[in-house]
């Protein structure tokens, strides 16, 4: 089901293949098809939920979902080994150039939005943080290496050292945080604990009093604390939420994408249309992300 052309296009809800989702959510009958879907760890849980629910919609289509990171998914798309790549960051210019060499046209489909939350140990007294302070913590040349640099006395953290928990560099979350917080031309400080998965970040912060980490809001739990985030010193402090991701009030929110190799057709198009339908968008909302529009879901 892999197609090949040569330019990049952006696809909106109605423009994803040129028609709206079927009102009854039922795709046309086809022979047995397996769609390969790979990429973002942020999206993997909701992608698995979509795949499971879609079995009831069309038993003739199976969706094989794997993670590995946004970069891994996009690389697989460009190599022609997946039908859909999941990404929590935009495709890079160099990836587009490689796509052209491979005769592939990556088409972007925004399937939801995510608030990138900051996670702290539950005993951390820090209730709010600015984007500039996050940069001081994570960026090369940043001035915050100890909690006392932020005016914080951290219980259980005798060293006072800020333990920076981050993601591996094939992660879309890593790339988005670098773009939104560290800024153009900046680099991460050396010495962070770079983990494979979103849940891994939250789990380590939960167990480490000195730690700070970042991950998708959907991975939050009652054992960690999330400070509100201020765009600058004068801005309102906004807690991470699906609503803040939708209206743009939360400073570090991002779109979540699926990429296809060319305009989707057949079973791929029917599946994406269903994801963008109210049923599919209610599923992403139920998983802690923000849908692309207001949808009415069951009680």
Region locations from a protein language model:
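Exported/periplasmic ABC-transporter solute-binding proteins
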Residues: 16-114, 119-299
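Sec-dependent bacterial lipoprotein signal peptides
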Residues: 1-14
